[in-house]
């Protein structure tokens, strides 16, 4: 078994939810965001008679997951696809007993992908989770979008109140040369920011906005939600881990809109990481877990 870069968040809380519905016969666990396989490996190690369907849009990280989960050969089915595409194009042989979607970006992408996800690394701006599929990269966006389009993007998907100042600096820089790397963009943003105390890096919100836009993350989430609940078995659970308010609001409102006769919300308030987990795993600090249970089909 190989090593992984990413520590799965809220793992104990996911296991606690699984305990509610686990049955020792034909249990199907769907990991919509397999990553390196952290959540799935823990589930497979704890429960002997369980089948995992692992969905991952990045073929490179999917191969890492296959190496990490090699000891569970025969218990995991792998699919290289976006989770919304998978559920719209494939039919499960049986309804799922548990569906998990961890919407965070893997530490592998920040540390090892070389695609410019992190402003601490000096990498070519890309941010596509599946670059082989084509589509606009972050490089294309920051070098070709006009003023209004860039301002709207950074404000809408990043909640960045200094979007106009940032875009003004980007456009000035573009007059001289193209913005090629994540470190380059981070420097432009930092210089545009007012000199105020911040809890986060000035580039955080802009990088989030670019990544969300490049990968169409919010659209994919909205598209997936009805597909996920439709794929649950009777008494099945859908658990979703979000990492920013835009995602969390979408999930919260969708859950509230479901029939109270058919679905039971298991998290009246989102579950957050414990003090100890936050201390040991910085990635868990902004994580929120919401879950529902399907009472009948």
From Swiss-Prot:
GO cellular component, one term: cytoplasm
Annotated GO MF terms: rRNA (cytosine-N4-)-methyltransferase activity
BP terms from Gene Ontology: rRNA base methylation
Subcellular location: Cytoplasm
Enzyme Commission designation: 2.1.1.199
Positions bound to S-adenosyl-L-methionine: 37-39, 56, 87, 102, 109
Reactions this protein catalyses: cytidine(1402) in 16S rRNA + S-adenosyl-L-methionine = N(4)-methylcytidine(1402) in 16S rRNA + S-adenosyl-L-homocysteine + H(+)
Keyword S-adenosyl-L-methionine: yes
Annotated keywords: Cytoplasm, Methyltransferase, rRNA processing, S-adenosyl-L-methionine, Transferase
Pfam families linked: Methyltransf_5
HAMAP family according to UniProt: 16SrRNA_methyltr_H
Its job: Specifically methylates the N4 position of cytidine in position 1402 (C1402) of 16S rRNA.
Entry's family note: Belongs to the methyltransferase superfamily. RsmH family.
Protein's recorded name: Ribosomal RNA small subunit methyltransferase H
Species per Swiss-Prot/TrEMBL record: Borrelia hermsii (strain HS1 / DAH)
């Amino acid at each position: 078994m190989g090593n992984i870069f990413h520590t799965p968040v809220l793992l104990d809380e996911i296991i606690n939810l699984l305990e509610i519905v686990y049955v020792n016969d034909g249990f199907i666990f769907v990991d919509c965001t397999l990553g390196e396989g952290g959540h799935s490996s823990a589930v497979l190690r704890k429960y002997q008679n369980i089948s995992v369907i692992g969905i991952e849009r990045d073929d490179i990280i999917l191969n890492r997951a296959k190496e990490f989960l090699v000891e569970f050969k025969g218990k995991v089915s792998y699919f290289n696809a976006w989770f919304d595409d998978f559920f719209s194009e494939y039919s499960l042989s049986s309804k799922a007993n548990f569906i998990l979607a961890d919407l965070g970006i893997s530490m592998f992408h920040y540390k090892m992908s070389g695609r410019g996800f992190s402003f601490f690394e000096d990498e070519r701006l890309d941010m596509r989770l599946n670059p082989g599929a084509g589509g606009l990269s972050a490089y294309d966006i920051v070098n070709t979008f006009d003023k209004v389009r860039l301002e709207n993007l950074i404000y809408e998907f990043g909640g960045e109140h200094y979007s106009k100042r940032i875009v003004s600096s980007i456009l000035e820089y573009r007059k001289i040369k193209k913005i090629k790397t994540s470190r380059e963009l981070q420097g432009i943003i930092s210089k545009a920011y007012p000199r105020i105390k911040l809890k986060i890096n000035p580039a955080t919100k802009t990088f989030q906005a670019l990544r969300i836009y490049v990968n169409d993350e919010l659209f994919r989430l909205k598209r997936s939600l009805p597909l996920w609940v439709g794929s649950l078995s009777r008494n099945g659970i859908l658990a979703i881990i979000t990492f920013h308010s835009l995602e969390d609001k979408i999930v919260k409102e969708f859950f509230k809109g479901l029939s109270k006769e058919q679905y039971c919300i298991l998290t009246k308030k989102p579950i957050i990481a414990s003090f100890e987990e936050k201390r040991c795993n910085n990635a868990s600090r902004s994580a929120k877990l919401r879950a529902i249970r399907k009472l009948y089909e």
